Amino acid sequence: MIWHVQNENFILDSTRIFMKAFHLLLFHGSFIFPECILIFGLILLLMIDSTSDQKDRPWFYFISSTSLVMSITALLFRWKEEPIISFSGNFQTNNFNEIFQFLILLCSTLCIPLSVEYIECTEMAITEFLLFVLTATLGGMFLCGANDLITIFVAPECFSLCSYLLSGYTKRDVRSNEATTKYLLMGGASSSILVHGFSWLYGSSGGEIELQEIVNGLINTQMYNSPGISIALISITVGIGFKLSPAPFHQWTPDVYEGSPTPVVAFLSVTSKVAASASATRIFDIPFYFSSNEWHLLLEILAILSMILGNLIAITQTSMKRMLAYSSIGQIGYVIIGIIVGDSNDGYASMITYMLFYISMNLGTFACIVSFGLRTGTDNIRDYAGLYTKDPFLALSLALCLLSLGGLPPLAGFFGKLYLFWCGWQAGLYFLVSMGLLTSVVSIYYYLKIIKLLMTGRNQEITPHVRNYRRSTLRSNNSIEWSMTVCVIASTIPGISMNPILAIAQDTLF
């Protein structure tokens, strides 16, 4: 009898929860319409994979790419609408969040064609790969619009779990397993520290979880200058630092870059930084409004360490992927300058602009690495010697992307850094900008060293990998070259016409 009553209560409670969720989705679903498109794409992928006897791979790519493009279209149609807070304060929709969601969707859209040939050559399971990519994209999009502590924790966990699975996708590779283990352990530790910081914020504000309500709660409780807020600030900085991977929270980055499948590295190298940057700007700017001097100092230290260590250690690397790992650590130091400058001096606009260029530069470089790796099976920098003699298009594409990453004019990377450093200088961050300029010069050195190998490799320096280089005849070859071409164009042409991009970025401010 007691069991029967308990069972009835459980059914009633479950029904209430389901009805409440259905009510929220019915009345607030339009506010997350781009996310709903991705969810529908995920369901469609699962249905086709479980019901079709003959796996028709082009359909999986088509469904994934179409859902991403449709989601981008839905975002563009919603541009410049009034800011809206939905789902009982859990989710906020405004231009600032949507531009970061657009960047994440753009990354995923470019990464899928980039990975087609790799998946065919390595015979990886295509459905699971696309499911993890779309789910990680969904988690990143929810993180960009998260407006309370619970959503800010759950959304990156959705992204992180898919990232762990993607990084260990080649199960037979010892390096991949080692990278996944390190990534998983450090990711779990950072999530624990992040939640610890959230608990201090929650307690100090009198039990508030929404970002703006936390500020009001801190004013009411007079706890905005308490030691608890300092503990929360340090803990949250460490937690977010793992996602952004600045020094000294970068230990996982080189191993994961080297051990994971290259298309996965391309995806993680940009999407994780875009989503974490969006979250960091909101967390530091709103709940820690009264501790701006403290978090400015913390981020300045992280930026300086990242720019110095990332670029200096990159010089000594012999693997292309490890070199790009340390390069990305240096690049995030430049992005942090925009976060510190904030809204007052176009800091966020400069950060968004540089992020857009960084996506094209980084993905273009990885597209070249994927293409070269599939033809030769090597990742060593010296094995690129003389590539121009065998594949001029690939060599020129890689050279342009590397030059843009280094910030040489008139490429997009130069104007992105120029705008970022100018905003930092206007805000009085003279030492930080000076370090950025010096480390940019250092980065140009190791990029030019690779370009010299590509273009001027002598006959005795050309390795058997390039000497026996053969272009692929697979039908999917066009897809990776398509991604490569788009990224190369985006790394060069925007440097000539910057005004429209800056105008769009400046419209995304709070």
Curated annotation (Swiss-Prot):
Q: Which keywords annotate this record?
A: Chloroplast, Membrane, NAD, NADP, Plastid, Plastoquinone, Quinone, Thylakoid, Translocase, Transmembrane, Transmembrane helix, Transport
Q: Which GO terms describe its biological process?
A: ATP synthesis coupled electron transport; photosynthesis, light reaction
Disulfide bonds, which pairs?
A: none
Q: What interactions and quaternary structure are annotated?
A: NDH is composed of at least 16 different subunits, 5 of which are encoded in the nucleus.
What role is this protein assigned? NDH shuttles electrons from NAD(P)H:plastoquinone, via FMN and iron-sulfur (Fe-S) centers, to quinones in the photosynthetic chain and possibly in a chloroplast respiratory chain. The immediate electron acceptor for the enzyme in this species is believed to be plastoquinone. Couples the redox reaction to proton translocation, and thus conserves the redox energy in a proton gradient.
The entry's family comment says: Belongs to the complex I subunit 2 family.
InterPro entries named in the record: NADH-Q_OxRdtase_suN/2, ND/Mrp_TM, Ndh2_N
| Superkingdom of this protein's organism | Eukaryota
Protein's name according to its UniProt entry: NAD(P)H-quinone oxidoreductase subunit 2, chloroplastic
Known PANTHER family for this protein? NADH DEHYDROGENASE
Where is this protein localized, as stated in its record? Plastid, Chloroplast thylakoid membrane
* Gene Ontology molecular function, alphabetical: NADH dehydrogenase (ubiquinone) activity; quinone binding
Q: Per the record, what are the reactions this protein catalyses?
A: a plastoquinone + NADH + (n+1) H(+)(in) = a plastoquinol + NAD(+) + n H(+)(out); a plastoquinone + NADPH + (n+1) H(+)(in) = a plastoquinol + NADP(+) + n H(+)(out)
What is the source species?
Sisyrinchium montanum
Q: What is its EC number?
A: 7.1.1.-
Fetch the NCBIfam families from UniProt: NDH_I_N, PRK02504.1
Task: From the record, give the transmembrane residue ranges.
Answer: 24-44, 59-79, 99-119, 124-144, 149-169, 183-203, 229-249, 295-315, 323-343, 354-374, 395-415, 418-438, 484-504
Q: What is the lineage of its organism?
A: Eukaryota, Viridiplantae, Streptophyta, Embryophyta, Tracheophyta
Instruction: Report the GO terms under cellular component.
Output: chloroplast thylakoid membrane
Q: What class of enzyme is it?
A: translocase
Membrane topology, record value: Multi-pass membrane protein
